[in-house]
Amino acid sequence: MAGHSKWANTKHRKSAQDIKKSKIFTKITRKITISCLKNGTDVNKNFQLRRILEKANLYNLKKDLIQKAINRGKDKNKNIQKKSFNMKYAGYGPSGIVIIIFCNTDNSNRTISNIRNIFSKFKGKLVKYNDIKYLFNFFYYININNIVNNKEIVLSIIKKNNIKNFKQIDKNNMEIIIKLNKFKKIKKIFLSSSIVFTNVNLVIKPKNIYIINNIYKSKIKNMINLLKKLKETTKIIHNTKI
């Protein structure tokens, strides 16, 4: 009986691990497809895709699954993009922390229902995104390709526009960081010099970190983990340390 119990426990544990791994694989392949739709399939130009593929390799995601996800994101399959759209939701969690959830969904009613249920479970409440965004700073992380041929022009624009946050990633790529309210102006200046942004990522950081009591930490962790497990979730931002 003891041997049977041990075998049953091992089987149950393996089954739970397989389910967890399957959810991770689903989320990674979804991110690959979305990244390809937004920024193309060339990893030399799409640095977001490169990072996702590195993560896929860490989890030993099969190459055929990766390729299928990439194929879904190619230009010939843009009908996928029409079926789904990006949404963002916000709310207050335990101890009053603010949480922003970014989603890519093909059914906004289902998504908001799932998110609302999680907030209710932890006695939180959903609010309008515009009501809480003042609590965060918004930056664009921008990649510029082909620096070898345009380095002098790029550095000149950076200097004239007082862009202080920039770095050269390798001999052919540079990353610059621009505040949200300056993005359109800076983009226009670069375009006037025939320099195109090859990858653009919005980064959101809280203006102040909200220190929470240890009593609430486990609740907040559990809540955020449940939100992350939703297949539609692409990113979660909050204003505390856990």
UniProtKB/Swiss-Prot annotation:
The keyword DNA-binding applies. It is found in: Cytoplasm. One of its GO terms (molecular function) is DNA binding. GO terms for cellular component: cytoplasm. GO terms for biological process: regulation of DNA-templated transcription. It comes from the Bacteria. This is Probable transcriptional regulatory protein BCc_197.
